[in-house]
UniProtKB/Swiss-Prot annotation:
Region annotation Disordered: where it falls in the sequence: 40-61
UniProt main location, coarse: membrane
Positions with biased composition (Low complexity): 47-59
Protein's recorded name: TM2 domain-containing protein 2
Protein backbone atom coordinates (compact mmCIF):
# COMPACT_ATOMS: atom_id res chain seq x y z
CA UNK A 1 0.00 0.00 0.00
CA UNK A 2 1.34 3.41 -1.02
CA UNK A 3 0.41 6.63 0.82
CA UNK A 4 1.48 9.91 -0.82
CA UNK A 5 4.04 8.16 -2.93
CA UNK A 6 5.71 6.40 0.08
CA UNK A 7 5.06 2.85 1.22
CA UNK A 8 3.24 2.56 4.58
CA UNK A 9 5.85 0.07 5.83
CA UNK A 10 8.58 2.63 5.18
CA UNK A 11 6.70 5.27 7.19
CA UNK A 12 6.17 2.85 10.09
CA UNK A 13 9.86 1.96 10.09
CA UNK A 14 10.87 5.61 10.20
CA UNK A 15 8.43 6.23 13.06
CA UNK A 16 9.81 3.34 15.09
CA UNK A 17 13.37 4.59 14.52
CA UNK A 18 12.41 8.09 15.66
CA UNK A 19 10.67 6.68 18.75
CA UNK A 20 13.71 4.56 19.63
CA UNK A 21 16.01 7.57 19.24
CA UNK A 22 13.77 9.63 21.50
CA UNK A 23 13.80 6.94 24.20
CA UNK A 24 17.60 6.74 24.07
CA UNK A 25 17.92 10.51 24.46
CA UNK A 26 15.47 10.50 27.37
CA UNK A 27 17.35 7.72 29.18
CA UNK A 28 20.63 9.54 28.68
CA UNK A 29 19.23 12.76 30.16
CA UNK A 30 17.74 10.96 33.17
CA UNK A 31 20.95 9.07 33.96
CA UNK A 32 23.01 12.25 33.65
CA UNK A 33 20.68 14.15 35.97
CA UNK A 34 20.76 11.30 38.52
CA UNK A 35 24.57 11.19 38.54
CA UNK A 36 24.75 14.95 39.09
CA UNK A 37 22.33 14.75 42.02
CA UNK A 38 24.29 11.89 43.58
CA UNK A 39 27.64 13.70 43.45
CA UNK A 40 26.44 17.20 44.30
CA UNK A 41 26.07 18.02 48.02
CA UNK A 42 22.42 18.75 48.80
CA UNK A 43 21.60 21.93 50.67
CA UNK A 44 18.43 20.57 52.22
CA UNK A 45 17.45 16.94 52.67
CA UNK A 46 13.99 17.73 53.97
CA UNK A 47 11.87 20.80 54.52
CA UNK A 48 13.13 22.76 57.49
CA UNK A 49 15.98 20.34 58.35
CA UNK A 50 19.42 21.39 57.12
CA UNK A 51 22.06 18.67 56.84
CA UNK A 52 25.49 19.80 58.10
CA UNK A 53 28.86 19.04 56.58
CA UNK A 54 31.56 16.72 57.83
CA UNK A 55 31.68 13.23 59.33
CA UNK A 56 29.61 14.28 62.36
CA UNK A 57 26.64 15.32 60.28
CA UNK A 58 24.24 12.93 61.98
CA UNK A 59 25.03 14.49 65.34
CA UNK A 60 24.14 18.12 64.51
CA UNK A 61 20.84 18.36 62.70
CA UNK A 62 19.09 21.68 63.26
CA UNK A 63 15.40 21.72 64.16
CA UNK A 64 13.67 24.68 62.52
CA UNK A 65 10.32 23.52 61.16
CA UNK A 66 7.71 21.62 63.24
CA UNK A 67 6.33 20.15 60.01
CA UNK A 68 9.68 18.59 59.13
CA UNK A 69 9.95 14.76 59.16
CA UNK A 70 13.06 15.12 61.36
CA UNK A 71 12.01 15.07 65.03
CA UNK A 72 13.85 16.16 68.15
CA UNK A 73 16.05 13.46 69.66
CA UNK A 74 14.19 13.81 72.96
CA UNK A 75 11.01 12.58 71.23
CA UNK A 76 12.56 9.29 70.07
CA UNK A 77 11.02 6.05 71.43
CA UNK A 78 12.97 4.09 74.03
CA UNK A 79 14.24 1.54 71.50
CA UNK A 80 16.22 4.24 69.67
CA UNK A 81 17.96 5.75 72.70
CA UNK A 82 20.34 4.61 75.43
CA UNK A 83 19.98 5.91 78.98
CA UNK A 84 22.35 5.95 81.93
CA UNK A 85 21.45 4.49 85.30
CA UNK A 86 19.74 6.86 87.74
CA UNK A 87 22.18 8.91 89.82
CA UNK A 88 22.37 7.67 93.41
CA UNK A 89 22.72 10.59 95.85
CA UNK A 90 22.70 8.20 98.85
CA UNK A 91 20.19 10.34 100.71
CA UNK A 92 22.02 13.64 100.06
CA UNK A 93 19.14 16.04 99.40
CA UNK A 94 21.49 18.99 98.81
CA UNK A 95 23.29 17.19 95.97
CA UNK A 96 19.95 16.21 94.47
CA UNK A 97 18.75 19.83 94.49
CA UNK A 98 21.99 21.12 92.97
CA UNK A 99 21.98 18.58 90.14
CA UNK A 100 18.25 18.79 89.60
CA UNK A 101 17.72 15.05 89.27
CA UNK A 102 18.77 11.80 90.88
CA UNK A 103 17.54 9.36 93.51
CA UNK A 104 17.65 9.79 97.27
CA UNK A 105 16.68 6.15 97.79
CA UNK A 106 16.21 3.06 95.67
CA UNK A 107 13.65 0.30 95.83
CA UNK A 108 10.01 -0.07 96.72
CA UNK A 109 7.25 -2.57 96.08
CA UNK A 110 4.27 -0.39 95.14
CA UNK A 111 4.39 2.34 92.49
CA UNK A 112 3.75 5.00 95.12
CA UNK A 113 6.74 3.77 97.15
CA UNK A 114 9.22 4.12 94.27
CA UNK A 115 10.91 7.44 93.57
CA UNK A 116 11.01 8.66 89.98
CA UNK A 117 13.62 10.92 88.44
CA UNK A 118 15.16 12.09 85.18
CA UNK A 119 18.15 10.34 83.61
CA UNK A 120 20.68 11.32 80.95
CA UNK A 121 19.93 9.71 77.57
CA UNK A 122 21.40 9.96 74.09
CA UNK A 123 20.31 8.87 70.64
CA UNK A 124 21.91 5.72 69.28
CA UNK A 125 24.58 6.02 66.62
CA UNK A 126 23.12 6.08 63.12
CA UNK A 127 19.77 7.50 64.25
CA UNK A 128 19.10 10.83 62.54
CA UNK A 129 17.27 13.35 64.72
CA UNK A 130 17.39 17.05 65.54
CA UNK A 131 19.93 18.12 68.16
CA UNK A 132 20.68 18.02 70.99
CA UNK A 133 21.44 14.30 70.89
CA UNK A 134 21.93 14.17 74.68
CA UNK A 135 18.91 15.01 76.79
CA UNK A 136 17.01 14.19 79.99
CA UNK A 137 14.26 11.56 79.93
CA UNK A 138 11.81 11.99 82.79
CA UNK A 139 9.83 9.64 85.02
CA UNK A 140 12.39 6.86 85.32
CA UNK A 141 11.95 4.67 88.44
CA UNK A 142 14.68 4.64 91.08
CA UNK A 143 15.17 0.89 91.07
CA UNK A 144 18.19 -1.30 90.42
CA UNK A 145 18.81 -5.00 89.93
CA UNK A 146 21.80 -6.86 91.36
CA UNK A 147 20.97 -10.46 90.48
CA UNK A 148 18.53 -11.40 93.25
CA UNK A 149 15.59 -13.59 92.20
CA UNK A 150 12.53 -14.05 94.38
CA UNK A 151 11.93 -17.72 93.51
CA UNK A 152 15.56 -18.67 94.21
CA UNK A 153 15.59 -16.86 97.54
CA UNK A 154 12.26 -18.40 98.53
CA UNK A 155 13.61 -21.89 97.85
CA UNK A 156 16.73 -21.09 99.89
CA UNK A 157 14.54 -19.91 102.74
CA UNK A 158 12.27 -22.96 102.65
CA UNK A 159 14.94 -25.67 102.41
CA UNK A 160 18.01 -24.00 103.98
CA UNK A 161 16.45 -21.23 106.02
CA UNK A 162 17.42 -22.86 109.32
CA UNK A 163 21.07 -22.25 108.38
CA UNK A 164 20.48 -18.61 107.38
CA UNK A 165 21.28 -19.21 103.72
CA UNK A 166 18.46 -16.92 102.60
CA UNK A 167 19.74 -13.97 104.62
CA UNK A 168 23.33 -14.64 103.56
CA UNK A 169 22.11 -14.54 99.96
CA UNK A 170 20.36 -11.19 100.49
CA UNK A 171 23.37 -9.63 102.17
CA UNK A 172 22.01 -9.53 105.74
CA UNK A 173 25.19 -11.08 107.14
CA UNK A 174 24.73 -10.17 110.82
CA UNK A 175 21.24 -11.59 111.18
CA UNK A 176 22.24 -14.55 108.99
CA UNK A 177 24.94 -15.53 111.48
CA UNK A 178 22.45 -15.28 114.33
CA UNK A 179 19.97 -17.39 112.43
CA UNK A 180 22.65 -19.98 111.73
CA UNK A 181 23.77 -20.23 115.36
CA UNK A 182 20.20 -20.63 116.62
CA UNK A 183 19.20 -23.01 113.79
CA UNK A 184 16.57 -20.63 112.54
CA UNK A 185 15.47 -19.58 116.02
CA UNK A 186 14.37 -23.19 116.63
CA UNK A 187 12.10 -22.94 113.61
CA UNK A 188 10.35 -19.71 114.58
CA UNK A 189 12.77 -17.41 112.76
CA UNK A 190 12.66 -19.72 109.75
CA UNK A 191 8.86 -19.43 109.57
CA UNK A 192 8.89 -15.65 110.12
CA UNK A 193 11.38 -15.11 107.28
CA UNK A 194 9.18 -17.13 104.94
CA UNK A 195 6.26 -14.83 105.72
CA UNK A 196 8.47 -11.73 105.33
CA UNK A 197 9.72 -12.90 101.95
CA UNK A 198 6.22 -13.56 100.64
CA UNK A 199 4.85 -10.23 101.90
CA UNK A 200 7.83 -8.16 100.74
CA UNK A 201 9.19 -7.42 104.19
CA UNK A 202 12.54 -9.09 103.51
CA UNK A 203 14.43 -7.60 100.57
CA UNK A 204 18.08 -7.41 99.43
CA UNK A 205 20.22 -5.32 101.76
CA UNK A 206 21.54 -3.11 98.93
CA UNK A 207 18.06 -1.73 98.19
CA UNK A 208 17.74 -3.51 94.86
CA UNK A 209 14.57 -5.09 93.52
CA UNK A 210 13.88 -8.66 92.50
CA UNK A 211 15.02 -9.48 88.98
CA UNK A 212 12.14 -10.21 86.64
CA UNK A 213 12.04 -13.61 84.95
CA UNK A 214 10.67 -13.39 81.38
Amino acid sequence: MVLGGCPVSYLLLCGQAALLLGNLLLLHCVSRSHSQNATAEPELTSAGAAQPEGPGAAASWEYSDPHSPVILCSYLPDEFIECEDPVDHVGNATASQELGYGCLKFGGQAYSDVEHTSVQCHALAGIECASPRTFLRENKPCIKYTGHYFITTLLYSFFLGCFGVDRFCLGHTGTAVGKLLTLGGLGIWWFVDLILLITGGLMPSDGSNWCTVY
